[in-house]
């Protein structure tokens, strides 16, 4: 999937992206059961426990710009607009780690060979969607609301 990447040096410079963890806390509007509700707690843990060594970023899609304001992470945009797919691929590829709901960017991350985890509730299984790879794993739980930020944080391997 590396073929999908493009040069994002201007975006990297603008946002001073060197070491960063990218989160995808979004999901399809009609599939809210895929959404893990503890991303802000995870962001706080990452910032506190890792002493701000890693920037925490999100990259919302075109219909997620308003929702992105609810997260205490830096929002990566291109001139105020959502990144295009090749830009998103490059942002993911250069990341230190990815944490995502079961979304398109989670599957992109798995196929780009980056380190990360996807969070699955009862809507489907990681096995059924074949998301796990050597560096990309899944956390499967019956109820995403009961999956703590601490448990997710402990799975982050940098």
What positions do the PLM features span?
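Mid-sequence helix-capping/hinge segment at a functional interface
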Residues: 1-32
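Short glycine-centered, acidic/aromatic-flanked micro-motifs in structured strand/loop junctions
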Residues: 25, 58-60, 141
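Short, well-ordered secondary-structure micro-motifs
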Residues: 33-35, 69-70, 129
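Donor-binding and catalytic core of enzymes assembling or modifying cell-surface/extracellular glycoconjugates
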Residues: 38-117, 121-124
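Alpha-helical elements of Rossmann-like donor-binding domains used by nucleotide-donor carbohydrate transfer enzymes
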Residues: 10, 38-41, 70, 87, ...
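Nucleotide-sugar donor-binding patch of glycosyltransferase catalytic domains
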Residues: 107-158
């Amino acid at each position: 999937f590396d073929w999908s990447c493009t040069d994002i040096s201007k975006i990297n410079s603008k946002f001073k992206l060197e070491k960063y963890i990218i989160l995808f806390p979004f999901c399809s509007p009609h599939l809210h059961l895929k959404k893990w509700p503890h991303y802000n707690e995870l962001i706080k843990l990452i910032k506190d426990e890792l002493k701000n060594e890693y920037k925490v970023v999100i990259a919302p899609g075109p219909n997620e710009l308003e929702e992105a304001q609810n997260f205490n992470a830096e929002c990566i945009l291109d001139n105020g607009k959502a990144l295009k797919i090749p830009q998103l691929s490059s942002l993911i590829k250069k990341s230190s780690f990815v944490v995502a709901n079961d979304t398109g960017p989670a599957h992109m991350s798995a196929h780009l060979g980056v380190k990360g985890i996807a969070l699955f509730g009862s809507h489907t299984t990681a096995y059924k969607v074949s998301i796990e790879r050597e560096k990309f794993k899944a956390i499967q739980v019956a109820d995403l609301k009961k999956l703590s930020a601490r448990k997710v944080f402990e799975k982050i391997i940098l």
